[in-house]
Structures are given as structure tokens and as C-alpha cells.
């Protein structure tokens, strides 16, 4: 039996998968190898890079033109700035790959000999030089996780490859493929041996090209999910197929995680006589988000980095990016957190990430909340919007000011505290979805609890800006129209200096939107 997997690399005998060599332009790759080019494959984590490298390894070694060897350099990360030990680990990994993949037992002996007589600054180059000289076919090393190396160890590797480059293909590899998360040109290498930051492009200026492994396309998502149908007879409804694409935008790990949860973990999905429905996919999505599975937790952890905050904070606030360094934007795209959307500019990569990021940022505020009685529930357990509004106003007046300090992003602190409160409201019984974008001037929230849907728009009144009430009412009209609702909340956080304390200024009143919808305006 095969299954969807989130622990790569994929094995076609065990896992549903797309043919790895079809995920990139194989003719282009083979052309670069034939031209003796050194190049890079990069993509966000858990997108299939290693699976593609291993498929290429098998493809090349089945032919008679090249001998390819795969080596994962992550083991050298533990040595950080210790060049001798780090480069020794790189040499050993390549030699073991030669032994295990090519049956070249002599490579490990050569590695030991080289390491006894060479320093870390020359060991990799010396080993590759001597190993290639005795080869009947040109050598193609596939070096994975190259960006696990840092500082002096990364510089040492790149410079040795550059130094040996003129000797290819008889006394050095014909082609070297480096694989990692970031494009090498965007590396900013802080080496203890150098007084200035070194860019990857200057340390490895022999690189011919950078290939980026993309996410799945919509047809590829359908093809992958159909593998399960072919094997088991269990179908995905058209709505479920569309929902997987809409939620993930083809991010490979997310596609597999949703499908695995729906088909192999949820009791309804394990019944192969029942189709996988949109509702099952939505339940799987909520499970992944609430449980902060490893992939999502790793992304959320990046929010602590200053260069990530410089981009994500204005996106959440709906303001312009301002003077954000170009490298920060490239970094978030390389991480897979963001993408450039046609006609929209920079945006969060997919709806699941769009949910995870603000939820992660609101976690500390949520943990800081005092005990709150659920006065917003009717006797039958349904949500009462009027009582929820009263509960929020009481909560905000009493706890808003101190809780703002618990939010990690100052510009959106009110948003995060509000979301923390709403997560307490829906705990175990509803969902909270968010919409935000650069320059939109707002964040939209949609709270669903049973049959009740409550939409709200969050705006900030900043120094020097006019009262956002009129703009907010117009914008909220459009949001409510899209949801088919005729009422909602407009929350205006007053962040101007010199305002009365939150406990004194928080108030609400009823307004009509330009299209006649009933709006509760909350000034906080």
C-alpha cells in the first residue's frame, strides 16, 4: 500500500508522488552538465529538492556518460567555523557516497589519506582532484544542503570548488550541482576570517545558473491526489480537489499533509467507500494549523527574525513596505513564506501560511489572557453577537492596555490582542480566517461559530491621518458583500499620541454603510 508522505525524499514504491525528473526541465539540466557548468538548485524546505537530486543521480548513473555521486553536507553544520573538521566531514560524505552509490570502495581510503595530509582549506579540492584523475567517466557531484554550512566552512568549500574549476573535467568534476534553500547570489556570509561580509556570488562566481524548483501546479495537485484514487478507488470530490489547491497553492508538503490527514488519519477518510469531501479537507487544514505541525512551526519560528518582521509586519498592518531592503524580500520568497503574485505584488504564499503567521504572533498574547467567562454563548451553545460585543468591550477596557505589551510586533499589537481574544471565543467550536495585504489599509476577520458568521474589519488611526471611519465603512461593505452578510463590525484602533487611556476611549455606536448595511463601529 502506498500513502501520501511528508517525510522526504519520496520513494515511488511507498509514496504517491509525481515523477521527480518531470518537476524540472531535465533537458536544461542535461545541457548544463554537457556544457561543464556548475549550477545551483534551490527551493523552500520540503518541496522535493532532495527527491529530484536522487532521481537525477539514478538517471545519470544508469547511463554511460557520467558517474554521479550524492552527498548531504548537513553533517558538517555541527562544526560551524571549524574549517578543518567541517571540510573533513564534506570529504567523508562524498567518499561514502562514492562507496555506496558507485561501489567505489577505494574512495574512502583516498579520503583518509587526503585528510591526513591536507588542511580544511585544501582537503575538498585535493580529494576531488585525485578522485577524478582516476575516473573513466566525468564526475558529477550533487551536493545537498550546502547552505547548512556557515561562515568560514561555507567560504572554504566554495573557494575550493572555484580553485579546481579550471581543471575540469579530467582532474576535477565536470559539473557540480549545489542544492539549498536560497539562491547563492543572496548569501551574506559572515566569516570570522574576513573583515567584511562576503556575498555568495563573489565567493562562487563560476556559477552558471540558478534553477528554482517550483510548487505543484493545479493539474499536478490533481494528478497527485488521483494516484490515491487509482490505488484505492476512493475519490476526491471536485470541490475537495479545488479546495486543496486553493489552500496550498501547490506547496508540496502542505498538499501531502492535507491529503494524508484526510485519507489516512481521519476515521471518515479511512472508509474507502466514502469520498474525500471539501469538509474533510477543511477539517484537515484546521488540524494542521491548530497543532502547529513541524513544517508550520518552523515557518512561524522565522517570524522572530528582524528581516522577516520588516516585511511581514506591514503586510499584516495593510501598510506600504517602505524602505525594505531588496534582500529581505528575496529571503522571504526563498523561504517560501511569500510569493510574487501576478497583478498583486508580494503576498503570503498560500492561505494556510496566511492563517498560521498571525496566529503564531498572537500566541503570547493568547497565553497572557486572563480567565474569561464565555458570556457570549446562548443557553443552547450558539454564539450571541451582541453579548460577544459587550464581552469584548469589557475585556478591552480592562486588559487591552497591559496586553499590548505582550505582542511581538508593535505596529499590529491591537490586532494580535484582538485575535488572541477571538481565539479564546472559538476555542474548540469555530474558525477564524483573516485577509490582509500590503497597502490595503486594513485587516479583515471572519469568525464562524456554528451557523453564525461574524465579519469584522480592523483599521488603525495613526498620527497625521484622517479618521478612517468613512473609508472603513466603504471597505467593509465590499467584504460583507463577498460573504453575503448585511451586518458586521468595524474596529478602529486609535494609535495617535496623546489619546486618553484605552479604558476611557473605548466605545461603540451603530452606523449604516454606504450600501445600507448595519455596522457596529468600535473605537478602541
Model-derived regions, located:
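Walker A/P-loop-proximal flanking segment of P-loop NTPase domains
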Residues: 1-47, 51-60, 126-131, 386, ...
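Conserved NTP-binding/hydrolysis module of P-loop NTPases
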Residues: 6, 68-69, 80-105
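The catalytic "switch" region of P-loop NTPases
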Residues: 9-10, 153-239, 244-247, 265-289
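Winged-helix-like regulatory helical subdomains adjacent to P-loop NTPase cores
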Residues: 23, 219-222, 226-335, 341-342, ...
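Conserved catalytic segments around the Walker B and adjacent sensor/switch elements
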Residues: 62-79
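Mid-core helix/loop region of P-loop NTP-binding domains shared across ATPases and GTPases
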Residues: 96-156, 162-175
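Active-site metal-binding core of divalent-cation-utilizing nuclease and nuclease-like domains
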Residues: 424-451
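Nucleic-acid nuclease catalytic cores
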Residues: 469-473, 477-508
Amino acid at each position: 500500500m502506498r500513502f501520501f508522505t511528508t517525510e522526504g525524499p519520496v520513494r515511488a514504491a511507498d509514496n504517491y508522488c509525481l515523477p521527480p525528473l518531470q518537476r524540472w526541465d531535465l533537458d536544461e539540466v542535461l545541457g548544463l552538465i554537457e556544457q561543464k557548468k556548475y549550477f545551483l538548485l534551490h527551493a523552500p524546505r520540503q518541496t522535493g529538492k532532495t527527491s529530484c537530486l536522487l532521481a537525477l543521480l539514478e538517471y545519470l548513473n544508469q547511463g554511460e556518460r557520467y558517474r554521479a555521486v550524492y552527498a548531504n553536507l548537513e553533517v558538517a553544520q555541527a562544526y560551524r567555523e571549524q574549517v578543518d573538521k567541517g571540510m573533513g566531514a564534506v570529504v567523508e560524505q562524498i567518499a561514502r557516497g562514492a562507496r555506496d552509490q558507485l561501489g567505489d570502495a577505494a574512495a574512502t581510503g583516498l579520503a583518509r589519506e587526503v585528510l591526513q595530509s591536507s588542511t580544511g582549506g585544501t582537503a575538498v579540492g585535493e580529494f576531488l582532484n585525485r578522485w577524478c584523475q582516476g575516473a573513466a567517466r566525468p564526475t558529477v557531484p550533487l551536493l545537498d544542503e550546502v547552505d547548512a554550512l556557515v561562515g568560514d566552512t561555507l567560504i572554504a568549500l566554495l573557494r575550493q570548488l572555484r580553485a579546481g574549476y579550471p581543471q575540469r573535467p579530467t582532474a576535477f568534476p565536470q559539473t557540480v550541482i549545489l542544492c539549498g534553500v536560497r539562491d547563492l547570489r543572496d548569501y551574506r556570509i559572515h566569516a570570522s576570517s574576513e573583515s567584511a561580509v562576503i556575498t555568495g556570488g563573489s565567493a562562487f562566481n563560476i556559477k552558471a545558473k540558478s534553477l528554482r524548483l517550483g510548487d505543484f501546479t493545479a493539474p499536478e495537485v490533481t494528478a497527485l491526489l488521483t494516484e490515491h484514487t487509482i490505488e484505492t478507488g476512493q475519490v476526491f470530490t471536485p470541490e475537495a480537489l479545488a479546495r486543496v489547491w486553493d489552500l496550498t497553492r501547490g506547496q508540496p508538503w502542505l498538499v501531502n499533509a492535507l491529503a494524508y490527514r484526510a485519507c489516512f488519519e481521519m476515521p471518515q477518510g479511512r472508509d474507502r467507500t466514502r469520498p474525500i469531501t471539501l469538509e474533510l479537507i477543511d477539517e484537515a487544514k484546521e488540524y494542521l494549523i491548530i497543532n502547529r505541525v513541524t513544517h508550520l512551526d518552523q515557518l512561524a519560528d522565522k517570524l522572530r527574525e528582524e528581516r522577516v518582521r520588516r516585511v511581514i509586519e506591514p503586510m499584516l498592518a495593510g501598510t506600504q513596505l517602505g524602505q525594505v531592503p531588496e534582500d529581505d524580500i528575496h529571503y522571504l520568497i526563498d523561504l517560501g513564506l511569500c510569493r510574487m503574485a501576478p497583478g498583486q505584488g508580494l503576498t503570503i504564499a498560500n492561505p494556510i501560511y496566511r492563517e498560521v503567521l498571525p496566529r503564531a504572533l498572537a500566541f503570547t498574547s493568547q497565553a497572557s489572557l486572563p480567565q474569561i467567562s464565555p458570556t457570549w454563548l446562548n443557553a443552547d451553545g450558539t454564539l450571541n453577537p451582541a453579548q460577544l460585543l459587550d464581552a469584548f468591550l469589557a475585556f478591552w477596557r480592562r486588559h487591552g492596555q497591559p496586553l499590548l505589551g505582550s505582542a511581538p510586533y508593535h505596529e499590529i499589537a491591537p490586532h494580535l490582542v484582538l485575535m488572541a481574544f477571538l481565539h479564546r471565543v472559538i476555542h474548540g467550536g469555530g474558525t477564524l480566517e483573516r485577509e490582509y495585504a500590503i497597502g490595503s489599509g486594513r485587516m479583515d476577520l471572519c469568525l464562524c461559530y456554528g451557523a453564525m458568521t461574524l465579519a469584522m474589519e480592523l483599521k488603525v488611526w495613526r498620527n497625521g491621518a484622517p479618521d478612517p471611519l468613512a473609508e472603513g465603512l466603504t471597505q467593509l461593505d465590499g467584504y460583507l458583500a463577498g460573504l453575503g452578510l448585511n451586518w458586521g463590525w468595524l474596529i478602529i484602533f486609535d494609535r495617535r499620541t496623546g489619546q486618553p487611556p484605552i479604558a476611557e476611549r473605548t466605545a461603540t455606536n451603530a452606523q449604516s454603510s454606504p450600501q445600507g448595511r448595519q455596522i457596529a463601529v468600535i473605537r478602541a
